[in-house]
Amino acid sequence: MSQPFASRGLAWFQALAGSLAPRPGDPASLRVADAELDGYPVRFLAVVPDPDNPFPRARQGEVGLLEGWGLAAAVDEALEADREAPRKRALPAIVDVPSQAYGRREEALGIHQALAGAVDAYARARLAGHPLIGLLVGKAMSGAFLAHGYQANRLIALHDPGVMVHAMGKAAAARITLRSVEELEALAAKVPPMAYDIDSYASLGLLWRTLPVETVEVPSTADLVRVRTCLGEALADILGGPRDLGGRLGAANREASARVRRLLREQW
């Protein structure tokens, strides 16, 4: 067996869920653990690196075929188990995903369906009353973030340079836009949606809260207390509000989006 890659997602999963090994039957790149948060039942979920993944494109924490379908199955399992329960367990998604898994085999075998399956499961769980919380501890990139975390009622990001959200990595974005990385960074400084830093992303109104920590790679006791407290506050906020994602639309940098939505409603 190869040695595991360093992973913020795995470090925070172990700290919060008190578990390290995958469940029997789950892919080695998926972590699922049931626990409690302020006395409320929760199911923590994370995608982590697996250097022995049978799909080479998914060995460094990418979300691929096994991960997409595995997330969907784990969420559906909770959805079915709690169907008649008065309290639907919360689903905190610990997000540290560098990309979806690009590859010919992934495309041929339907990675679009695997990721859509995860999105669908999360969305159905949220609409059924399961509180969803996304905790961004590392990269939240591209379709991987859409499949794991983006459907959350509340998104929380650790305030650290290694926490970033974007459609693609800088090198790829520079190639696509026919710019150098330096030119891309200069553009990002003026256009928040093009930026990679978490403060620019927060200015778009998508984050519920950013949270400073002392040691993001290896959570300290103080970090763990701070994050668990914030998760508990997010849970209480979700339970007292609507299940939709409308709270993301009010930021000043989303005025154009709000106007487009208003015009579409008027035309409809």
Language-model segment annotations:
Residues 23-41:
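N-terminal short beta-loop-beta anion/metal-coordinating cradle
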Residues 1-24, 174, 178-268:
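Amphipathic alpha-helical segments at domain termini/boundaries
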Residues 69-102:
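A structural preference for short, pocket-lining loop segments at secondary-structure junctions
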Residues 55-59, 102-107:
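Short acidic, glycine/proline-rich loop/turn micro-motifs
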Residues 64-78, 109-119, 224-231:
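Well-ordered, non-membrane alpha-helical segments in soluble/globular domains
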Residues 106-223:
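Conserved catalytic cores of soluble enzyme domains
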Residues 44-46, 93, 134:
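Structural beta-sheet core signal
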Residues 38-69:
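STAS-typified acidic loop motif
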